[in-house]
Amino acid sequence: MPEGPEIRRAADNLEAAIKGKPLTDVWFAFAQLKPYESQLTGQIVTRIETRGKALLTHFSNGLTLYSHNQLYGVWRVIDTGEIPKTTRILRVRLQTADKTILLYSASDIEMLTAEQLTTHPFLQRVGPDVLDARLTPEEVKARLLSPRFRNRQFSGLLLDQAFLAGLGNYLRVEILWQVGLTGQHKAKDLNEAQLNALSHALLDIPRLSYTTRGQADENKHHGALFRFKVFHRDGEACERCGGIIEKTTLSSRPFYWCPHCQK
């Protein structure tokens, strides 16, 4: 599943295609969304926001399209009039004079009013987004030490969108390697230096992934600045200590680590 940097990059591409342009045609696959087709035609997309792995497409009439790609959903940008070659099932089409964005295969799609945005179950449950520039390491540290999260092992905590939105497995692996910790640790057991290092890494690594490339290719490195240090590198030498990177399973997900320098 794509993680926060990939979702934000996808949103950037969608915004670049249609933001600020009048919608010339709107189509939804689901019956409950059909009434909104006429309401949105002629409106403009004002911005596309990410909340972790969910996308919020905001329209000029105050409505917001909520979509969560889950495992199979994917957005695409095409030239208007182009017929894409795909076997995927189309769910949403937002068309302007020159560009069209398409959502395929997703099933978690809703139209929300401004009031409904504040009460939506997923949006209420999800934590602060790691790519939100307003989120600081100090706030992350306070969240780590809060009664809700301080007793949680990092193996599960760093996958929990209620803790920090946008984290996922490759980010979990790389963050813990960066700070030299294993997934069995809990925030309550860390010293001040470890807490500070982890609080910064929880923001720095996702943001570096987003700004340098932001696309998940699990068999290749991430751009020139951010590259995988341990993810999918089992059997290779750790660049920090020379130990051999190992692969195991934590919280039902593949986990890569260096037993020599992650303690």
Curated annotation (Swiss-Prot):
<keyword id="KW-0479">Metal-binding</keyword>
<dbReference type="GO" id="GO:0000703">
    <property type="term" value="F:oxidized pyrimidine nucleobase lesion DNA N-glycosylase activity"/>
</dbReference>
<dbReference type="InterPro" id="IPR015887">
    <property type="entry name" value="DNA_glyclase_Znf_dom_DNA_BS"/>
</dbReference>
<keyword id="KW-0378">Hydrolase</keyword>
<keyword id="KW-0234">DNA repair</keyword>
<feature type="binding site">
    <location>
        <position position="125"/>
    </location>
    <ligand>
        <name>DNA</name>
    </ligand>
</feature>
<dbReference type="Pfam" id="PF01149">
    <property type="entry name" value="Fapy_DNA_glyco"/>
</dbReference>
<dbReference type="InterPro" id="IPR035937">
    <property type="entry name" value="MutM-like_N-ter"/>
</dbReference>
<keyword id="KW-0227">DNA damage</keyword>
<keyword id="KW-0456">Lyase</keyword>
<feature type="active site" description="Proton donor; for delta-elimination activity">
    <location>
        <position position="253"/>
    </location>
</feature>
<feature type="binding site">
    <location>
        <position position="169"/>
    </location>
    <ligand>
        <name>DNA</name>
    </ligand>
</feature>
<feature type="zinc finger region" description="FPG-type">
    <location>
        <begin position="229"/>
        <end position="263"/>
    </location>
</feature>
<keyword id="KW-0511">Multifunctional enzyme</keyword>
<keyword id="KW-0862">Zinc</keyword>
<dbReference type="GO" id="GO:0003684">
    <property type="term" value="F:damaged DNA binding"/>
</dbReference>
<dbReference type="InterPro" id="IPR015886">
    <property type="entry name" value="DNA_glyclase/AP_lyase_DNA-bd"/>
</dbReference>
<keyword id="KW-0326">Glycosidase</keyword>
<comment type="function">
    <text>Involved in base excision repair of DNA damaged by oxidation or by mutagenic agents. Acts as a DNA glycosylase that recognizes and removes damaged bases. Has a preference for oxidized pyrimidines, such as thymine glycol, 5,6-dihydrouracil and 5,6-dihydrothymine. Has AP (apurinic/apyrimidinic) lyase activity and introduces nicks in the DNA strand. Cleaves the DNA backbone by beta-delta elimination to generate a single-strand break at the site of the removed base with both 3'- and 5'-phosphates.</text>
</comment>
<dbReference type="InterPro" id="IPR044091">
    <property type="entry name" value="EcNei-like_N"/>
</dbReference>
<dbReference type="GO" id="GO:0140078">
    <property type="term" value="F:class I DNA-(apurinic or apyrimidinic site) endonuclease activity"/>
</dbReference>
<feature type="active site" description="Schiff-base intermediate with DNA">
    <location>
        <position position="2"/>
    </location>
</feature>
<dbReference type="InterPro" id="IPR000214">
    <property type="entry name" value="Znf_DNA_glyclase/AP_lyase"/>
</dbReference>
<comment type="similarity">
    <text>Belongs to the FPG family.</text>
</comment>
<dbReference type="InterPro" id="IPR010663">
    <property type="entry name" value="Znf_FPG/IleRS"/>
</dbReference>
<dbReference type="Pfam" id="PF06827">
    <property type="entry name" value="zf-FPG_IleRS"/>
</dbReference>
<feature type="active site" description="Proton donor">
    <location>
        <position position="3"/>
    </location>
</feature>
<dbReference type="Pfam" id="PF06831">
    <property type="entry name" value="H2TH"/>
</dbReference>
<dbReference type="GO" id="GO:0008270">
    <property type="term" value="F:zinc ion binding"/>
</dbReference>
<keyword id="KW-0863">Zinc-finger</keyword>
<keyword id="KW-0238">DNA-binding</keyword>
<feature type="active site" description="Proton donor; for beta-elimination activity">
    <location>
        <position position="53"/>
    </location>
</feature>
<feature type="binding site">
    <location>
        <position position="70"/>
    </location>
    <ligand>
        <name>DNA</name>
    </ligand>
</feature>
<dbReference type="InterPro" id="IPR010979">
    <property type="entry name" value="Ribosomal_uS13-like_H2TH"/>
</dbReference>
<dbReference type="GO" id="GO:0006284">
    <property type="term" value="P:base-excision repair"/>
</dbReference>
<dbReference type="InterPro" id="IPR012319">
    <property type="entry name" value="FPG_cat"/>
</dbReference>
<dbReference type="InterPro" id="IPR023713">
    <property type="entry name" value="Endonuclease-VIII"/>
</dbReference>
<protein>
    <recommendedName>
        <fullName>Endonuclease 8</fullName>
        <ecNumber>3.2.2.-</ecNumber>
        <ecNumber>4.2.99.18</ecNumber>
    </recommendedName>
</protein>
